[in-house]
């Protein structure tokens, strides 16, 4: 699920540093230097630090200042091309491992949604680059014989406004800001709830374009009536 800190094919709560950045972090980490050295994973020239796991383990001992300093390098805050590199590498590792497993893995949102969120919503990247990102991952996992389930709604605006009413005011404000104050939304001068809906509609259109391009087993699930048990 989204938010799983042990996700086998994605990163959540993990930051990435080069050697210079990591050495600088260590020099400013005080008593936590040894903790960071024990928890860091070096992959090539990248130093990967699962900072949310560290926070969960150490709680208030892990200062907010240090947490915030590390989280600035979260993999989903890095430049688009660096994110693609790291996420594709993670999918490669997962594929190599999963080929030897006799298991079925069910993942939420990490295949298409995350790619479009960082590429389109956050950075407003060219459509071709975003499509290539998804297709790159699709190529990596093709030997796993994946199946894509795409959940859709007939009325996107109704669904979004329903979510805004059901979620906290903080969530509602945050999601509208995220979709309108950066990337695609900012470039197209969208603002407020109406603007966020325009961005969501554009994202859906690109998702459906990618869905049609993918050469894998795939099904659309219409969730307009919110009848999960009927699936």
Where are these regions (language model features)?
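Surface-exposed cleft-lining segments at the edges of enzyme active sites
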Residues: 73-85, 115-128, 193-194
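N-terminal phosphate/diphosphate-binding loop that engages ATP/GTP or pyrophosphate donors
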Residues: 1-75, 82
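Conserved phosphate-donor/acceptor-positioning beta-strand/loop module used by diverse small-molecule
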Residues: 107-110, 127-181
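Conserved, well-structured beta-alpha core segment at the onset of a catalytic domain
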Residues: 1-11, 92-139, 223-224, 228
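Phosphate-binding/switch loop-helix module in NTP-utilizing enzymes
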Residues: 68-102
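Well-ordered, non-membrane alpha-helical segments in soluble/globular domains
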Residues: 84-92, 124-137, 196-207, 231
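NTP-dependent small-molecule kinase module
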Residues: 174-231
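A structural motif corresponding to the C-terminal end of an alpha-helix
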Residues: 98-103, 136-149, 203-220
């Amino acid at each position: 699920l989204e938010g799983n800190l042990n996700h086998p094919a994605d990163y959540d709560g993990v930051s990435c540093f080069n050697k210079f950045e990591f050495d600088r972090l260590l020099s400013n980490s005080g008593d936590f230097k040894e903790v960071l050295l024990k928890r860091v994973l070096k992959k090539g020239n990248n130093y990967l630090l699962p900072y949310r796991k560290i926070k969960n383990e150490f709680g208030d001992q892990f200062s907010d200042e240090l947490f915030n300093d590390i989280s600035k390098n979260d993999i989903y805050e890095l430049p688009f091309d660096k994110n693609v590199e790291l996420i594709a590498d993670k999918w490669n590792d997962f594929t190599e491992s999963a080929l030897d497993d006799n298991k079925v893995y069910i993942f939420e949102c990490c295949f298409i949604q995350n790619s479009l969120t960082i590429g389109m919503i956050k950075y407003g990247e060219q459509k071709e680059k975003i499509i290539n990102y998804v297709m790159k991952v699709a190529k990596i996992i093709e030997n796993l014989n994946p199946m894509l389930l795409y959940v859709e709604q007939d009325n996107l605006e109704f669904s979004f406004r329903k979510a805004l009413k059901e979620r906290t005011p903080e969530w509602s404000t945050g999601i509208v800001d995220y979709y309108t104050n950066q990337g695609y939304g900012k470039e197209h001068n969208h603002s407020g709830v109406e603007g966020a809906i325009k961005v969501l509609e554009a994202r859906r259109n690109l998702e459906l374009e990618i869905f049609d391009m993918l050469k894998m087993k795939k099904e659309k699930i219409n969730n307009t009536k919110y009848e999960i048990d009927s699936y």
